[in-house]
Amino acid sequence: AIALSKLMIDARWVKRVLFLCDRKELRKQAANAFNQFTNEPLYVVGKSKKADRQNARIYIATYPGMMKIMDHFDVGYFDLIIADESHRSIYNVYGDLFKYFDALQIGLTATPIDMVSKTTFGLFGCEGRIPTANYSLEDAIADNNLVPYEVVTHTTEFLREGIKREKLSDAQIRELEEQGI
């Protein structure tokens, strides 16, 4: 996402980029990464000062955060929208974002192709449930970008038998009560 944004800004194909994600933690990670690899003015929706919005070239927002302020922007304000975690039910809940802005739209997901919603493929113009690009787990392992995984199953007495008050110490009971459990 960052490399594509930088490439398109440097080539003057886009002036402003909107990067959307589904959680504040991802918004923070994205802001740090964009700051590390680009020198473009950045605006983090819900975090940056409103005065910083005017000069920003890259905007980072959660889906709900952008929904709250999207009507402050003209439909042509962004030239590129990158939607992280685009496999989630974004079309049903946040589809208006993608319908409102007249911009090139890129959807990113790590979800296997057969688990992505048909409406998500349609939203990004990928008919027939065929993504524009796909990098499978198997390919990533073969290219040494990921290591093979092994599923390890563990269990605990609590998972097998449940929590029984009579087996807990007074300190454990107090701790659970303080946690609202």
Model regions: which residues?
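Conserved SF1/SF2 helicase motif Ia
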Residues: 2-26
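Interdomain helical connector at the RecA1-RecA2 junction of SF1/SF2 helicase-like NTPases
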Residues: 118-181
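Conserved nucleotide-binding/hydrolysis micro-motifs of P-loop NTPases
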Residues: 24-26, 64-67, 87-88, 103, ...
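Short glycine-/polar-rich loops that comprise or flank the Walker A/P-loop
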Residues: 13-15, 40-41, 77-78, 101-104, ...
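Inter-Walker segment of RecA-like/P-loop motor cores
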Residues: 34-72
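Conserved catalytic network of the ASCE P-loop NTPase/AAA+ motor domain
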Residues: 10-13, 51-54, 72-75, 97-101, ...
